[in-house]
Amino acid sequence: MNGVYAPTFCVGDKVLIVWNSGEYGKSRQYIVGGNKHMNYTLVDLLTGEFLTAPQDTLSDLREIIQNDIDNGIIKFIQIY
């Protein structure tokens, strides 16, 4: 563990993610999106692309992000 933990998300939160490396570049900004059918994901503010497949709950989304942190894919994450 690197001391970084996925935050508890709310729909409409803006999220800054700093990646260790890869196709996403050094850092990207996202917004937590969802609808009445509970399809939650992080939406890239620059491209509009979904970071994850739609999830049933915000807890499921948090778990996916935490797995990326634990696996060293995400270096830093912050809600702003």
How does the language model describe each region?
Residues W19-T57:
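Basic/aromatic-rich interaction segments and small domains that mediate binding to polyanionic partners
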